[in-house]
Swiss-Prot record:
Ranges in a coiled coil: none
Organism of this sequence: Baumannia cicadellinicola subsp. Homalodisca coagulata
InterPro entries reported for this sequence: Ribosomal_uL22, Ribosomal_uL22_bac/chlpt-type, Ribosomal_uL22_bac/org-type, Ribosomal_uL22_CS, Ribosomal_uL22_sf
UniProt keywords, alphabetically: Ribonucleoprotein, Ribosomal protein, RNA-binding, rRNA-binding
Assembly information from the UniProt record: Part of the 50S ribosomal subunit.
Protein name as catalogued: Large ribosomal subunit protein uL22
A GO molecular-function descriptor: rRNA binding
Amino acid sequence: METIAKHRYANSSAQKLRLVINLIRGKEVSKALEILTYTNKKAANLVKKVLESAIANAEHNDGADVDDLKIAKIFVDVGPSIKRIMPRAKGRVDHILKRTSHITVVVSDR
């Protein structure tokens, strides 16, 4: 049985998140949680929360055994960018893009 968890509009760029999700793709959830715990990146914390949510969803909604779960799919899509300006010298401005992402984790007991 496949179970999905999503975090939409995560405050991190897709490029930074993809560095982390590539470490855990296809692994067992216990091993993936261990890897994320010791990965020293902000994105690792975001991905860990979504993975824990997917595990809880599988356990509560589908009655799955946590020890049998593996990461079936994990991907990051680009979300909308929030546009900000930063004033500079001589009346100019720099444009700042605050990037967001959508994290999707699918766990399966097969």
